């Protein structure tokens, strides 16, 4: 059961880390589609904005200004949160790989491997926090912006939708939470499992068996007085 939980957590961790990295460095966090004309589709990301022509499929992208330039608060905070989530998730995944039983790293000390799994789980849990905050905050801001335009009857032909990059960020964050929960639960459920826990019992058992057999085979020698007493009692 321990190995199954570790492999399940590793599977979730690798995909969650990949989702977070792809979400951070792609350009489809918000889709701006003109349904009235259906000429082009505009995708806005954290680093650049791309427009795709609906007829010929030509895609042109414009990078944002330098990171030192003034940007909206939503963009700056989401960048910082997603980069933090990427770094933490990557560190947690590498730590988890070192803690797996199938990886030949410190094979003679299973307790260190258990601790590595716990550290990896804690790191993944922490990584999911900035990831989900950044993704949900961006999505809520997109929804609020769209609702405000509809409320004020402005640019009704333009629709703002969540792009697949935003969904990947949410999925990666939830995967980090689930992988971290599996690893931390795995540590507490199986913390007493290990060869060193059974070592004293294994040593005591043959020793006690040998002691019993030696006690049975040992016979105390009879003295002359004991022999004479035995003869007298027989008579």
Swiss-Prot record:
Protein name as annotated: Claudin-16
Matching InterPro entries: Claudin, Claudin16, Claudin_CS, PMP22/EMP/MP20/Claudin
Record-level GO cellular component terms: bicellular tight junction; plasma membrane; tight junction
Organism: Mus musculus
Recorded domain comment: The first extracellular loop contains negatively charged amino acids that affect cation selectivity.
Tissues expressing this chain: Expressed in the corticomedullary axis of the TAL, specifically in the cortex and the outer stripe of outer medulla (OSOM) zone (at protein level).
UniProt topological domain (Cytoplasmic) ranges: 1-3, 101-115, 191-235
Record's bilayer topology term: Multi-pass membrane protein
This protein's UniProt keywords: Cell junction, Cell membrane, Ion transport, Magnesium, Membrane, Tight junction, Transmembrane, Transmembrane helix, Transport
Gene Ontology BP terms: calcium-independent cell-cell adhesion via plasma membrane cell-adhesion molecules; monoatomic ion transport; paracellular transport; renal absorption
Principal location class: other
Protein family membership: Belongs to the claudin family.
Biological role: Forms paracellular channels: coassembles with CLDN19 into tight junction strands with cation-selective channels through the strands, conveying epithelial permeability in a process known as paracellular tight junction permeability. Involved in the maintenance of ion gradients along the nephron. In the thick ascending limb (TAL) of Henle's loop, facilitates sodium paracellular permeability from the interstitial compartment to the lumen, contributing to the lumen-positive transepithelial potential that drives paracellular magnesium and calcium reabsorption.
Gene name for this UniProt entry: Cldn16
């Amino acid at each position: 059961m321990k190995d199954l939980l570790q492999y399940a957590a590793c599977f979730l961790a690798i995909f969650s880390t990949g989702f977070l990295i792809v979400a951070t460095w792609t350009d489809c966090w918000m889709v701006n589609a003109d349904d009235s004309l259906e000429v082009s589709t505009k995708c806005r990301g954290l680093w650049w904005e791309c427009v795709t022509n609906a007829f010929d499929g030509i895609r042109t992208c414009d990078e944002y200004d330098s990171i030192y330039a003034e940007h909206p608060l939503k963009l700056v905070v989401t960048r910082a949160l997603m980069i933090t989530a990427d770094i933490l998730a990557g560190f947690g995944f590498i730590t988890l790989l070192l803690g797996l039983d199938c990886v030949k790293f410190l094979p003679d000390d299973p307790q260190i491997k258990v601790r590595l799994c716990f550290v990896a789980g804690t790191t993944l849990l922490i990584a999911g926090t900035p990831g989900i905050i950044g993704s949900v905050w961006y999505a809520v801001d997109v929804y609020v912006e769209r609702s405000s335009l509809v409320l004020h009857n402005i640019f009704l032909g333009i629709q703002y939708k969540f792009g697949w990059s935003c969904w990947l960020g949410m999925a990666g964050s939830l995967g980090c939470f689930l992988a971290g929960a599996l690893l931390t639960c795995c540590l507490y459920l199986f913390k007493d499992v290990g060869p060193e826990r059974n070592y004293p019992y294994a040593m005591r058992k043959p020793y006690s068996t040998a002691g019993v057999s030696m006690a049975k085979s040992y016979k105390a020698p009879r003295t002359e007085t004991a022999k004479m007493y035995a003869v007298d009692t027989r008579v």
